[in-house]
Amino acid sequence: MIDQARQAAALTAIEAALGAGAVDRSPAVLARYATPLAIPAGVVLPANEAQLAVALSAAKGAGGILQPVCNGAHGLEKTGLDKVIVLDLQRMNRILEVNEDLAYCLVEPGVTFRELDAYIKSKNFKLWVDFPGNPDESVAASFVERSAGYTPYSDHSLMQCGLEVMLADGRLVRTGMGAMPKSTCWQLFKFGYGPWVDGLFTQSDFAVPTKVGTWLMPEPPAFKTFMVTVESEDGLAPLLDVLGPLKLNMVVANGVAVGNALHEAALLGKKRSDYAGQGPMAASAVEAAGKALGLGYWNLYGSLYGLPDNVSILWDLVNGAFGSVPGAKVIADGRGVDPRLWSWRMGTMTGAVASPPAAIAQWSGNQALTVNPVSPVDGEDAMRLYELSRDTCAEHGFDMVSEAVAIWRSANHRQFLPSTGSDKSSAARTRACAEALIGAQAEAGFGQVFTEPGLRATVDKTFASGGLSTLHTRVKKALDPTALFASA
């Protein structure tokens, strides 16, 4: 339980130090960060590192607790704790450098993918920005949360290079080659000298990111995007059995998305109320919903890149491989697919940063909680995860609305649980389903790759063996001994 008097004192101290413009307590603003179960005490909006250091010092002196976010807050569990002070870094939004020749950028935490893409286009740089589907997400947040996109640069943790964070005591730390004053390789060589610590500042409450470097993809000479649909629910296994070797051997190098029919229908603005019946839809109804939109039960999106002749050779291989899947249809021209979906999906794989046609959450609500398990890119495992997740969702009255993104040897799954955000009973039902999913998936050997603030304690319990939680606790005590930054 957070001490409200201390939070009020912390906000007053920050306001006194930085001025009224740096703190917002208005109900309209708090509502953007609130959930039915948690309302922040206020929002602090530093404009630069100097103001951030002052805010941390003032909050620490008053015994306040802060929850840092890079640019707004997203998802149903946007605030993990009731009466926490949100430290929103959206005003720290400078694009510090974009280097076309070496294909990297250095940005502050408030910079979004849309803003970075617009800057690159304004300079006519031949560089692509990989984004995880939401163009208004912060580039830094995507690294911190270990998000994934859809180009060959889909693994945002892997493509991050160079980091600056501010510790709870106001000290700035540059990682990797950034620790060397005259380094020429801060955004070029990830590891620097000595222990590599960048990962400590992802999915943690140890510090606040102030600068993040990331690699950008040079525009390739040629590419070929494609889609593969499979009609039946059980077609997921053979589809991924073909995809696995193609990913492992880097034939299909991008972050390959595989969305079920309901996920793709939701992207097109369809709602549960558009279909007959009540409660979770049966497999036959999901299949019919996909077919009506020119989609399969499963819909895979991939792309090939390189020299024109090489792309042509690889296309013959890939087309034949996916064509061997029972009930599969390989589409390379978008024929029969809604042009809005085709354009957006193909764009995500070719550096076109844009909003999707519609928001997934509106399938049956206005917000969504996500559960994010990881599986091997293997048909049997992926099907096992899907079936147990589908059944758990059905037990709680939810449809299975899901997408997986295959990156290297694993697939990151995003399972959406839409909810009416202003309704406490709806939010509680959604959270109960999410907790049940996390537990069932852990029992089956599938761990989470990301979770929203309000579910961290639930996920932490599934990673309790092997001494990892003890190590995290020791690091937290060393870097933030007064727990200035919130642990949900």
Question: Where are each of the predicted segments found?
Answer:
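Generic non-transmembrane alpha-helical segments
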Residues: 9-20, 54-62, 119, 242-250, ...
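Glycine-rich N-terminal segment of FAD-binding domains in flavoprotein oxidoreductases
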Residues: 27, 32-92
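FAD-binding subdomain of flavoenzyme oxidoreductases
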Residues: 96, 109, 114-248
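C-terminal substrate-recognition/cap domain of FAD-linked oxidoreductases
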Residues: 228-232, 237-433, 451-456
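Activity-critical C-terminal alpha-helical subdomain
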Residues: 448-488
